[in-house]
Amino acid sequence: MSYNGIGLSSAKGSSTSGYVQQSLAFTNRKKDPRLTTHDKEQQQQQQQQQIQPAKDESVISHKAKRQIELLVSEYRDKLEDGPDDLSDDTIDSKCEDYRRSILEGNEQSRSQN
């Protein structure tokens, strides 16, 4: 007497006829307009919560400074590992010149935008 595996395998001893009915308490979310509008509102609220605020200008400038220092650090490593035996003072001066050139390049690109 089971219907697709639902219900009793045998009505014997259950005090019922074993007839399987559709559950009227079940509601299909796709067909019920009351539930779909509520679900859409919840999705919109979740999307609004996931939107990230605009970044602060200080954070952006800090990241730019870190990128510049990374380039200068790589340049310093290249000078220190190079075949020329340069003193620390000359390496420092070359790194300062390189840093200035990068900063001037960034300022020129900002002024063009």
UniProtKB/Swiss-Prot annotation:
Function statement: Involved in pre-mRNA splicing. May function at or prior to the first catalytic step of splicing at the catalytic center of the spliceosome. May do so by stabilizing the catalytic center or the position of the RNA substrate.
Composition bias type Basic and acidic residues, residue spans: 29-42
Chain spans, region Disordered: 1-61
Polar residues biased stretches: 11-26
UniProt protein name: Pre-mRNA-splicing factor CWC21
SMART domains xrefs: cwf21
Family the entry assigns: Belongs to the CWC21 family.
Keywords linked to the UniProt accession: Cytoplasm, mRNA processing, mRNA splicing, Nucleus, Spliceosome
Disulfide bridge map: none
GO cellular component, as recorded: cytoplasm; spliceosomal complex
Subunit structure and binding partners: Associates with the NTC complex (or PRP19-associated complex). The NTC complex associates with the spliceosome after the release of the U1 and U4 snRNAs and forms the CWC spliceosome subcomplex reminiscent of a late-stage spliceosome.
InterPro entries per the UniProt record, alphabetical: CWC21, mRNA_splic_Cwf21_dom
